[in-house]
Design a protein with these regions (language model features):
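Conserved SAM-binding motif I beta-strand of class I
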Residues: 117-122
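S-adenosyl-L-methionine
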Residues: 126-145
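Non-catalytic substrate-recognition/targeting regions of SAM-dependent transferases
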Residues: 6-75, 82
Length: 145
């Protein structure tokens, strides 16, 4: 994620490993899943910061490895951010977005950056706080509706 690499095995990834194992072994951190649920991160790079930022196009996000192998972002959603950002930019009218189960705000940030008014909703106060941080990091979106 960004300049750092994280190894996060997933039980849903049932296909064979196609990449060079040497590359996987260079990961800065490795998530080990527990058979009883959850798991823990093993930090192989002792200089790995607790939190860092990554960029996708003109968007910047805070990343922090958490339990259950979460990092604060679902990068596979970037294709969706691109899609609706273009729709928002091409609209001939103001766009209002209701982002439910919004997590740390990847979609919220993308929609705001595209010019939409966004209501961000998540049940976790911590995730809403993180989303607010993502909204204001490296951009002037904090005063947008």
């Amino acid at each position: 994620m960004g300049r750092l690499s994280l190894r996060r095995p997933d039980p849903q990834a049932v296909w064979s490993l196609k990449s060079d194992k040497k590359l996987w072994n260079k990961a800065d951190a490795w998530y080990h899943r527990s058979k009883s649920g959850g798991g823990k991160w093993e930090y192989l790079n002792k200089k790995l910061p607790e939190r860092w930022t990554i960029n996708y196009r003109n968007l910047t996000f805070n990343i922090k490895p958490m339990g259950f192998k979460h990092t604060g972002l679902f990068p596979e959603q970037a294709v969706n951010w691109d899609w609706f950002s273009e729709l928002i930019k091409k609209a001939d009218r103001p766009i209002r977005v209701l982002n439910l189960f919004a997590y740390t705000g990847g979609a919220t940030v993308a929609a705001l950056e595209a010019g939409a008014e966004v209501v961000h909703v998540d049940a976790s106060k911590g995730m809403v706080t993180w989303a607010k941080e993502n909204v204001v990091i490296d951009r002037d979106l904090g005063d947008r509706p």
